[in-house]
């Protein structure tokens, strides 16, 4: 994945800078999301690495996307096809999404808990993270009963493991060392 990110980063950055300049971040996010889905389609995948020329591949890809992609988006597709990089479109979309969140001072946080969190608990976690990260936080909550109790919060590079299973694992490691 690191290699895909390295390849995708210049395309994502160029698309993001252009979207900022044209005040079209949301529409570009939608376009890239759609293009990424097309590139991951089981019918499309073999064509991306097939025997088509770059211009044929770009034309086919643009035709499949139809009106979902504007002229500038089509230009990005053509450049990526010329460089044989259409298969990294999902990574381009992910990086674009990260750039967009960074620009908007937002972060997505994953909260895994042993039991379902109440709205009040989610609000408390969100407020604490917003204070700590100085960003607006969007929570993605899920339940994993194997945690026994507590939560694991992941926001970017930050990981807070407040689960009983995590504490037991850390205690076990200390006892073994």
Swiss-Prot record:
Keywords recorded for this protein, A-Z: ATP synthesis, Cell inner membrane, Cell membrane, CF(1), Hydrogen ion transport, Ion transport, Membrane, Transport
InterPro entries recorded: ATP_synth_OSCP/delta_N_sf, ATPase_OSCP/dsu
Record keyword Cell inner membrane present: yes
Subcellular location: Cell inner membrane
A single GO molecular function term of this UniProt record: proton-transporting ATP synthase activity, rotational mechanism
Membrane topology per record: Peripheral membrane protein
GO cellular component terms, semicolon-separated: plasma membrane; proton-transporting ATP synthase complex
Protein family per UniProt: Belongs to the ATPase delta chain family.
Subunit structure: F-type ATPases have 2 components, F(1) - the catalytic core - and F(0) - the membrane proton channel. F(1) has five subunits: alpha(3), beta(3), gamma(1), delta(1), epsilon(1). F(0) has three main subunits: a(1), b(2) and c(10-14). The alpha and beta chains form an alternating ring which encloses part of the gamma chain. F(1) is attached to F(0) by a central stalk formed by the gamma and epsilon chains, while a peripheral stalk is formed by the delta and b chains.
Described purpose of this protein according to its UniProt entry: F(1)F(0) ATP synthase produces ATP from ADP in the presence of a proton or sodium gradient. F-type ATPases consist of two structural domains, F(1) containing the extramembraneous catalytic core and F(0) containing the membrane proton channel, linked together by a central stalk and a peripheral stalk. During catalysis, ATP synthesis in the catalytic domain of F(1) is coupled via a rotary mechanism of the central stalk subunits to proton translocation.
Record's protein name: ATP synthase subunit delta
Gene assigned in the entry: atpH
